[in-house]
Amino acid sequence: MKHKFLFSVFIIFFIFVFIALGSWQIIRLNWKNNLILEIENSLKNPPVELSKSNKENFLRIKTSGTIDFEKQIYLYNLNDSGTPGFEVINPILIENENYLINRGWIPFEKKDTLEINIFDQNDITGTLKTQGRKNIFKPDNDIEENYWFSLNREDILQFTGKEFSKYIIYLDGNYQFPRPKKITANISNNHKKYAMTWFSLAISIL
């Protein structure tokens, strides 16, 4: 009798745990959905003049500055079709503050060609975005060959001798090469699946 009672307590405890975990995922799901909606609305807004007082993630901006083509960074990445190449990233000085501007993707053979630097730095429209975390499975950057796999801040400081804003400017526009990267609200949102898993586990042990 005692063992049966303890077993029932054990089962009830885990049912409550699974329900609590499922409920937490529902809360996270609502938060994530609201965040995605905010980002989508922000990306639909017209660009505003970049200033020190209005910087935020996914803010569309317009500005001008002085680009450093000598310290141009070539970041390995795939384009939307899955073709490997480089994203071209430059230091840019805007109102005495250093930023990195991601001008878009090029195929490998365009690296170090003059045509990719035909660019009007006095008429820049783009989107601010904070840098994502480094994937631990990516190789180290080859700074000497200017072949990058991540925007490691220590490597960037070594390469450029400068520190930069946490916001990267992703260029908008109809450029052929580099081809600007389209910024979307494509954020991982698996909370519904996780919630269903926890609730299913709670039901399965009834």
State where each predicted segment sits.
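Surface-exposed, charge/polar-rich loops and edge strands
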Residues: 1-54, 59-206
